[in-house]
Structures are given as C-alpha cells and as structure tokens.
From Swiss-Prot:
<dbReference type="GO" id="GO:0006370">
    <property type="term" value="P:7-methylguanosine mRNA capping"/>
</dbReference>
<dbReference type="InterPro" id="IPR049106">
    <property type="entry name" value="Flu_PB2_N"/>
</dbReference>
<dbReference type="InterPro" id="IPR049110">
    <property type="entry name" value="Flu_PB2_2nd"/>
</dbReference>
<dbReference type="Pfam" id="PF00604">
    <property type="entry name" value="Flu_PB2_5th"/>
</dbReference>
<keyword id="KW-0506">mRNA capping</keyword>
<dbReference type="GO" id="GO:0003723">
    <property type="term" value="F:RNA binding"/>
</dbReference>
<feature type="short sequence motif" description="Nuclear localization signal">
    <location>
        <begin position="736"/>
        <end position="739"/>
    </location>
</feature>
<protein>
    <recommendedName>
        <fullName>Polymerase basic protein 2</fullName>
    </recommendedName>
</protein>
<dbReference type="Pfam" id="PF20951">
    <property type="entry name" value="Flu_PB2_6th"/>
</dbReference>
<dbReference type="Pfam" id="PF20947">
    <property type="entry name" value="Flu_PB2_1st"/>
</dbReference>
<dbReference type="GO" id="GO:0039657">
    <property type="term" value="P:symbiont-mediated suppression of host gene expression"/>
</dbReference>
<dbReference type="InterPro" id="IPR048298">
    <property type="entry name" value="Flu_PB2_CAP-bd"/>
</dbReference>
<comment type="function">
    <text>Plays an essential role in transcription initiation and cap-stealing mechanism, in which cellular capped pre-mRNAs are used to generate primers for viral transcription. Recognizes and binds the 7-methylguanosine-containing cap of the target pre-RNA which is subsequently cleaved after 10-13 nucleotides by the viral protein PA. Plays a role in the initiation of the viral genome replication and modulates the activity of the ribonucleoprotein (RNP) complex.</text>
</comment>
<dbReference type="GO" id="GO:0039523">
    <property type="term" value="P:symbiont-mediated suppression of host mRNA transcription via inhibition of RNA polymerase II activity"/>
</dbReference>
<comment type="subunit">
    <text>Influenza RNA polymerase is composed of three subunits: PB1, PB2 and PA. Interacts (via N-terminus) with PB1 (via C-terminus). Interacts with nucleoprotein NP (via N-terminus).</text>
</comment>
<dbReference type="Pfam" id="PF20950">
    <property type="entry name" value="Flu_PB2_4th"/>
</dbReference>
<keyword id="KW-1157">Cap snatching</keyword>
Length: 759
C-alpha cells in the first residue's frame, strides 16, 4: 500500500509524466535484449543503417593488393583505417561492383554441373506457360509433397556416402557404396567435377539437392508433382489461382507416375493368377522402370498409393498405418473399436456377414478430389463434414462414408442382388459389394437416409439428397465445408503382413489394403516399363505375347532342349506358355496340342529326326491339355492383329519366319533372336519319324481305303497295309512290319522311299 501511494504522488507531478513519455529508452533489459548473443534481433534495420555507412564491409588485408584504392570515378574503395577490434580492412560497397567488373575470372564450365538443379529450374520456367488468374475460394489441403524437382531417390545415408566419396574422396571413414544407383552416380559425378574450383561445401550441398527427395507438408489445391510445387507461390493464393503448365518434366515425377502404373498393372495381373502373392513378387522382381529395377525403386520411393503399398507389403517393407476404403485414405484420429461378425439383411432380403466396428471413432478421409472428417459410433454415422472440388466428388465421399458407417438404413437401401466379382471372378467381400452397388446408383441410399434442419455455422452448408447445396436442410449428420481436411502428416511406417490373396493387415489384424482398393484408372507411363515376367506379356496385346513367347524359348533353348527330350510334361506345364493359349482359337487348342505332342513323341523315338526350328515353332501349342484325335494339320491358327493368322507346320509364314542363312528368327516381322541348330539335324524330315516300324511300299493305293492319320497306324496288325497321310498332305502306302528288330533302319530308308513314292 505504501508503494502505491508513493507512485500516485509521483504521477500527480507533471515532471514525472514528462520524463516517462519524452525521454529515450535506456532501460537495461532493452539494451540487453538487442545486444546480447550473436543472433541479430532486427536484421532488416541493421542492414539499412550498415549500408548507410561509408565502409559497411570488412575484408582480409590481402584485398589491398587485389583492388585499387580508388575506382575510375575516383571514389574510395577501401579505407586505410583498421576495423576496430580486428586486423581487417574497412571496405566500401563500391569495391564489390569493381570486383564484379574487373576482378579475376575463373572457368565457368563447372557451374551448370554443380548448380544443375537451378539451371534446370530456369529452363522449366522459361518454357512454362502461365495462364489467366482466376479469383475463387481455394480449397487447399495440406499434403506431403516433393519440393525438390530432378532428384534421384537415394536415402539420406546413401547420399551421404556418395557425397563424401565425390567431394572428399581422401577423408577417412568407412563408405560402402552398394546399390547400382550409388555406383553410377558416383562415377558420373567424379568425371563431371574433375578440377572443380567451387568450394567443396557448396558442391556437397548441391549434390544433396540432386540425390535426396525433400518433402514438406504444404497446403495445396491442384497439382502435387514437384514441378508444380516449385511454383506454388505463383499459382495459388488464398482467393486466387493462376493456371500454369510446366516447361519440362523431371525424372523423379516420371518415376513416381510410372511406378504407380506398373504397380497397378502388376497387382491387377497377380489377382487373377493361381497364387497371387507369388506371382506379384515374381513380377516385381523381374520388372524395370526406366532401366532401374522396380524393387530398388520400391525400397527408396516414398509414394503412397494402394497398389504401390501392396507391392511394398509383399516385399516386407513398412508402409503407412492408414487404411484404404473406396479410394479414400482413412486415418483414425481418436476413439477405438472392437470387431464383431454380424449378419444383416439387405432390402432384397439377402443375408450379408459383415465385420461390425463397435465403439466411437473419428477418422479423416482423404481422396484425390474430396476430403472429409467422419465421426461414427457402432453402425451409426454421427457426423460427416465433407469438402470437395465439385458435386460429383462430394457425392463419392458421402457414399463411401455412408457405407463405411454400416448403418442399417444403408443396408436396407440395397435393391436387387449383390453379386459383384473381382477380376479373378471371385465374389467381393460384403463391404465392397455394398460399395460397388451404391457407386453404381445411390439414389435410394440418399432418399432413405433422412434429412434434418441445420444451424447456421460459418463456412458450413447443408446438402440435399439430390446433392444440391441448401442453407436450411441437410442429409442427416452431413455438412459441406469450404475448408479441406489435411492429409495425414506423419511419415511413420508400420510393419504389416500380407496373405496370398494380397490382403494387407496391420499387427492387430485390421485390413489396411486389398486388391479391390486398387484403382482401375489406366494411364500411359512416362518412363519405359519393361516387364520381363511372362505374366505381363499380354499387357501390350497379342503380338507382344507371340514375340515374347518365342524370344523366351530361344533365350532358354539349352534348358528347353533337355526338358523336351527327358521331361516333356514338365516343359508343357511351364507358366511361360500360359499367355500364348489365349491366342489359339478355343475350339482348336486341344486338337493342336494332341497333334503337336504326337509329332514330338515321334521325333523323340526316331534318331536323326530332331528339328530345332520346328520344335520351337510348335512348342507353345503343346502346352494346352491335349485331345487325342485323328486330325492332321498343315498349319495352325493364332489370333493376332484382329484376325486369325497361320503358322505353317512346315515352312515359313509371316508369323514365324526362320532365315536359314542368317540363322535368325523373325516373329511378325520383329526379330526374336538367333538359333543354333544341332549339327546332325536337318537331313531327315519328320516323315521318317512318322513311319517307325512300317515299310513304305509306294504311292497311295485306293484299294486300301481312306488315308489314316499317323495316330491310327498303331491299330494296324503286323503285315497289314494302309494308306497314310504324311507331311504336307501327301499320301503313301505302308505295311506294318512283321518283326520289331529292323525299326531303326526304317527311319533311314523311309526318307528316301517317301521321296520316291511322292515323286
């Protein structure tokens, strides 16, 4: 009380008021604030008053030898006065101008190489086109984006080793360069930066920009690839956007885009094979994207997309803990639930077994074109706040949330039977059945959901069953917001497991991903994707299957040749022949196969009748389950180029053409590789193989009935005669031998005799 009284007395004197309002601030705390520590507290102000001085810069004494005291205009460039407290010289800003104009020059050859990312950015901006500015509300949502165009995808540790090896090769410290990309980059950079005079630290910083992906969590409306992010400040504000087309693409965006396409193709293909997981792994390991192994890219690339994450899970890599449903990424932000199987009845009285989530939970839902916040209890949607680019996108999000809520009125809104199947013709699980049903038509769902009056909340508006906005009424529990919902920012990755049907689960057993979640969108990859796996041959159509099948046979000929003679059944069952079957007319598959297998068996039985070209040509046809029949074929049909084309059993055709002189095979005009024939082949034809154990008597003799097929000869009794159809439709008369001993000589004499009989 005493002190307050004293202060009151002081304040009543006019002098006190004057001192407090007029005198300068020299309070110790203020002085301390602006003078303690090395950190500049007001850099802009400091710069202004420094630059107003005559000599704001200090430099090493050597500058006095390198720069004249005055410039051409007679202005002083440096002062002889020493800088207080150091033995440096005080220098004028004019000295910098003089140095830039008259100072020593150095080789500039390394600048574009070291500052490559900057030079490339300038080129992209120079060739980019900026369109009109539109003023409109921007729904931005924070997404994790790549802010560094043109980088390789090395991990921080891998990049560090490369940088040390390139910039400080003589420094001590263990560096292990293991991956192909590390070795390639190191070699390339060492060559580029020979005799480089740029400060090593600067080179190291710039290399880091080139090698490592840098991501930030930024508010974005629109394109998220790095060439758009680098101009984010030019293309979108709070209430405006400017159209922009980048003036060039960068490899990292192309890798991301191509990786997604490859992963989607592989997952779709694996789903329909007998063992999806094994097939998926085989394809991932044998695929290259832009010349780099897909598995290497998967290990380094942080892209989060359903198909990519399924491939990562299969390889045992960690993935994000969020889960996917209906093309939206769900992340639980609070609450918890237990799962229980429950049977429910649809509006069509079909029984569905669904896994019900019991308990209160909140989720964020993020899709490409819409985002939402969802609060739900057991089989009840409490609140959905959704925002999106347009009516359509908002409707998609609402359908997914309604199905996810598992509400009874949603299940009762089903009209008709649910029998959706996946690519492998297996029924989808009940939740995806419901989703597909309402994605096709959600009218009944929206009509039955119910509406309610709404309060006037800033930035929120109602939406009616016909998806029109409304200020008074809205679908029960559902509101549309002007603000987007941010993507989940954490980069945390969790250990997951995957079953053979490619369902990915977290350690609690929750399904995070399944092939049903993989988008059906088709795109054209920016980088070349090379699928070496036979399962992916059909992706480029029938011609590619044909060429690839024959290329594979030629590449593996040594192995195939042995199997052909020792274990043909195993050979016929090879998965590499699977795609080929789709080219053979369904009705003819079994007959062709039986015919070719018989032919091959005869070749095996008779010495000197092995024919490399013919085995290669006919082998794919033998893979189908065979049918024993008396059919003989002089040509086999394959469906390519939109119609049936013929492969001649003997001789060349546009489909299969072997050039004896060059020993090269062309399939549909494309080179399929070179063949090495066995030295002893090519003398005896298949005819001799056909006639093991028969004596050729001469030309056809009508008295012995119609010509038999090769298969039917086995029914003849010893000594019986018959006409037989051989080769290119020629018929000769034969007699079955009475003894077996002379079988081998038949094959040698048969060739000569047939020629005589035909001629």
């Amino acid at each position: 009380m005493e002190r307050i009284k004293e202060l009151r007395d002081l304040m009543s004197q006019s002098r006190t008021r004057e001192i407090l309002t007029k005198t300068t601030v020299d309070h110790m705390a203020i002085i301390k604030k602006y003078t303690s520590g090395r950190q500049e507290k007001n850099p802009a102000l400091r710069m202004k008053w420094m630059m107003a001085m005559k000599y704001p810069i200090t430099a090493d004494k050597r500058i006095m030898e390198m720069i004249p005291e005055r410039n051409e205009q007679g202005q002083t460039l440096w002062s002889k006065t020493n800088d207080a407290g150091s033995d440096r010289v005080m220098v004028s800003p004019l000295a910098v101008t003089w140095w830039n104009r008259n100072g020593p020059t150095t080789s500039t050859v390394h600048y574009p190489k070291v500052y490559k990312t900057y030079f490339e950015k300038v080129e992209r901006l120079k060739h980019g086109t900026f369109g009109p500015v539109h003023f409109r509300n921007q729904v931005k949502i924070r997404r994790r984006v790549d802010i560094n165009p043109g980088h390789a995808d090395l991990s921080a540790k891998e990049a560090q080793d490369v940088i040390m090896e390139v910039v400080f090769p003589n420094e001590v410290g263990a560096r292990i360069l293991t991956s192909d990309s590390q070795l390639t980059i190191t070699k390339e950079k060492k060559e580029e930066l020979q005799d480089c005079k740029i400060a090593p630290l600067m080179v190291a910083y710039m290399l880091e920009r080139e090698l490592v992906r840098k991501t930030r969590f930024l508010p974005v409306a629109g394109g998220t690839s790095s060439v758009y992010i680098e101009v984010l400040h030019l293309t979108q504000g709070t209430c405006w956007e400017q159209m922009y087309t980048p003036g060039g693409e960068v490899r990292n965006d192309d890798v991301d885009q191509s990786l997604i396409i490859a992963a989607r193709n592989i997952v779709r293909r694996a789903t329909v094979s007998a063992d999806p997981l094994a097939s998926l792994l085989e394809m991932c390991h044998s695929t290259q994207i832009g010349g780099i192994r897909m598995v290497d890219i998967l290990r380094q690339n942080p892209t989060e997309e359903q198909a990519v994450d399924i491939c990562k899970a299969a390889m045992g890599l960690r993935i994000s803990s969020s889960f996917s449903f209906g093309g939206f990424t769900f992340k639980r932000t609070s609450g918890s639930s237990i799962k229980r199987e429950e049977e429910v009845l649809t509006g069509n009285l079909q029984t569905l077994k669904i896994r019900v989530h019991e308990g209160y939970e909140e989720f964020t839902m993020v899709g490409r074109r819409a985002t939402a916040i969802l609060r739900k209890a057991t089989r009840r949607l409490i609140q959905l706040i959704v925002s999106g680019r347009d009516e359509q996108s908002i409707a998609e999000a609402i359908i997914v949330a309604m199905v996810f809520s598992q509400e009874d009125c949603m299940i009762k809104a089903v009209r008709g039977d649910l029998n959706f199947v996946n690519r492998a013709n297996q029924r989808l699980n009940p939740m995806h059945q419901l989703l597909r049903h309402f994605q096709k038509d959600a009218k009944v769902l929206f009509q039955n959901w119910g509406i309610e009056p709404i309060d006037n909340v800033m930035g929120m508006i109602g939406i009616l069953p016909d998806m029109t906005p409304n200020a008074e009424m809205s679908l029960r529990g559902i509101r549309v917001s002007k603000m987007g919902v941010d993507e989940y920012s954490s980069t945390e990755r969790v250990v997951v497991s995957i079953d053979r049907f490619l369902r990915v689960r977290d350690q609690r057993g929750n399904v995070l991903l399944s092939p049903e979640e993989v988008s059906e969108t088709q795109g054209t990859e920016k980088l070349t994707i090379t699928y070496s796996s036979s399962m992916m041959w059909e992706i480029n159509g029938p011609e590619s299957v044909l060429v690839n099948t024959y290329q594979w046979i030629i590449r593996n000929w040594e192995m195939i040749k042995i199997q052909w003679s020792q274990n043909p059944t195993m050979l016929y069952n090879k998965m590499e022949f699977e795609p080929f079957q789709s080219l053979v007319p369904k009705a003819a598959r079994a007959q062709y196969s039986g015919f070719v297998r018989t032919l091959f068996q005869q070749m095996r039985d008779v010495l000197g009748t092995f024919d490399t070209v013919q085995i290669i040509k006919l082998l794919p046809f033998a893979a189908a389950p065979p049918e024993q029949s008396r059919m003989q074929f002089s040509s086999l049909t394959v469906n390519v180029r939109g119609s049936g084309m013929r492969i001649l059993v003997r001789g060349n055709s546009p489909v299969f053409n072997y050039n004896k002189a060059t020993k090269r095979l062309t399939v549909l005009g494309k080179d399929a590789g070179s063949l090495t024939e066995d030295p002893d082949e090519g003398t005896a034809g298949v005819e001799s193989a056909v006639l093991r154990g028969f004596l050729i008597l001469g030309k056809e003799d009508k008295r012995y009935g119609p010509a038999l097929s090769i298969n039917e000869l086995s029914n003849l009794a010893k000594g019986e005669k018959a006409n037989v159809l051989i080769g290119q439709g020629d018929v000769v008369l034969v007699m079955k031998r009475k003894r077996d001993s002379s079988i081998l000589t038949d094959s040698q004499t048969a060739t000569k005799r047939i020629r005589m009989a035909i001629n």
